[in-house]
Regions:
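Short, glycine-/small-residue-enriched flexible loop/hinge segments at domain edges that mediate gating
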Residues: 70-85, 99-105
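N-terminal secretory signal peptides that target proteins for export/translocation
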Residues: 1-15
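Glycine-rich beta-to-alpha active-site loop
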Residues: 94-141
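N-terminal signal peptide c-region/cleavage motif recognized by signal peptidases
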Residues: 32-33
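Terminal peptide-recognition signature
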Residues: 49, 73-74, 114, 229
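STAS-typified acidic loop motif
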Residues: 37-60
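Extracytoplasmic/secreted envelope proteins and their assembly/folding machinery
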Residues: 58-62, 86-90, 94, 111, ...
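Charged, glycine-interspersed solvent-exposed loop segments at helix/strand-loop junctions
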Residues: 139-237
């Protein structure tokens, strides 16, 4: 495990019209290496998870949590992953009652697993922290207010991972299955991005909507007003 770093993040800060320092750009370098499968490292009572949540490490992860020695799961620099893997990691976290923390970047599958913690917080330190929660379509302000609060996060993820696949006669060859629709809706780069950037005045929190066309350049995402991650339940105090 490498120590946390700012590798891959491009950050620029500038004063807005109100004179407050705000986040103006956040990007992941195009030259960043492909995401590796999840790796686990136990550091005392903290289990550090880095890499993509693809399900390959779920058994080891579950075993670690059921041992009773882990109090906090720390996600560090995790990108991509599947909705199924997100659900499996989230279920294990929820069942064990551990806390979760993000140190660096936690995108897509990692973000939903992060929300399953008894408490879920951004880690301290000089790094830029960020999570991106995939959505099937742009959420309204009313949906944002409840979408990831408490058990709603579990229900939202379930939209991407249907558990019932009852066999039905196929009416037309072009008709997609419900399972197919749900999986097609899971786009790791399409979602709501929450960031915390260190400044001389403390951390600045911002929220953005990313339509998936931004690629690795999150500075192209649209900033959302009145979307404080604490008020929305994405982060706990």
């Amino acid at each position: 495990m490498k120590p946390p770093s700012l590798r891959g993040w491009s950050l620029s800060l500038a004063s807005g019209p109100s004179g407050l320092v705000g986040l103006m750009g956040l990007a992941i370098a195009l030259a960043a290496p492909p995401a590796a499968a999840a790796e686990l490292e136990l550091q005392g009572s903290r289990l550090v998870v880095s890499g993509m949540l693809d399900g390959s490490a779920i058994k080891e992860f579950t075993d670690r949590l059921t041992s009773g020695t882990v109090h906090t799961v720390v996600f560090e620099d995790s990108f991509g992953g599947t909705a199924d893997a997100a659900g499996a990691f989230a279920d294990a976290i929820r069942a064990s009652g551990v806390q979760t923390e993000v140190r660096g970047q936690c995108m897509a599958a990692c973000a939903y697993a992060f929300l399953a913690g008894k408490t879920h917080r951004f880690g301290y330190g000089p790094q830029v922290n960020g999570i991106l929660l995939p959505v099937a379509q742009r959420p309204t302000a009313a949906e944002l207010a409840v979408r990831w609060r408490g058990d709603e996060a579990h229900k939202t993820l379930a939209e991407f991972t249907p558990t019932s696949a009852v066999a039905k006669p196929i009416e037309t060859s072009a008709a997609p299955s419900a399972t197919g629709d749900a999986k097609d809706n899971w786009q790791p780069d399409h979602g709501v991005l929450f960031t915390a950037s260190p400044t001389l005045f403390g951390r600045i929190y911002n929220t953005y909507y990313c339509d998936g066309t931004q690629g690795r350049d999150f500075s192209k995402c649209e900033r959302l007003a009145d979307a404080d991650p604490f008020k929305l339940g994405v982060l706990t105090p």
